[in-house]
Amino acid sequence: MKIELCIEDIQRKSKPNSDEVRMIQNVLYKKIKKKEIDGIAESIAVNGKTSMLATYFETGEFSERIHSINFKQQQLIMLDFDNSKVDIEKYGITTYDYVRNHDFIKQNACFMYRTFSDKEAIVDKFRVVFVLNESVKDYLLIGNIYTKLFRLFPS
């Protein structure tokens, strides 16, 4: 099954700085690709390519280019575990191994990977990726999916 998402062509070996992030945000929404999940995992987790999971309808209005009113579809869900100071104080540390061995993750996640920030961090920083059975065209439904996942994994 091919999944549509926005993914850049540039391979990265480190986290982009704030100037690079702004440049990426200005063009990434135009870089729509259709890939199998294995190709997505390799692009993101191995090759460090920046991605945007949703695609959006084209608009001439710059401020609306990645706004919910132009939401087209999304089939991937990604949970970001940063173990920020606030999260640790509120929920404790969420480790990579704990999440990897969680029954829900074993049954439902496609892949997980450590982020660039993990390399210099004392705590684990990683992402877990899920693929939905079909492309979702309702922005609110995507929000509801995230809400339910955040209840399972509040940090």
Language-model features and meaning:
Residues 145-149:
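Amphipathic alpha-helical interaction segments
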Residues 150-155:
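Flexible helix-coil linker/hinge segments at domain or subdomain boundaries
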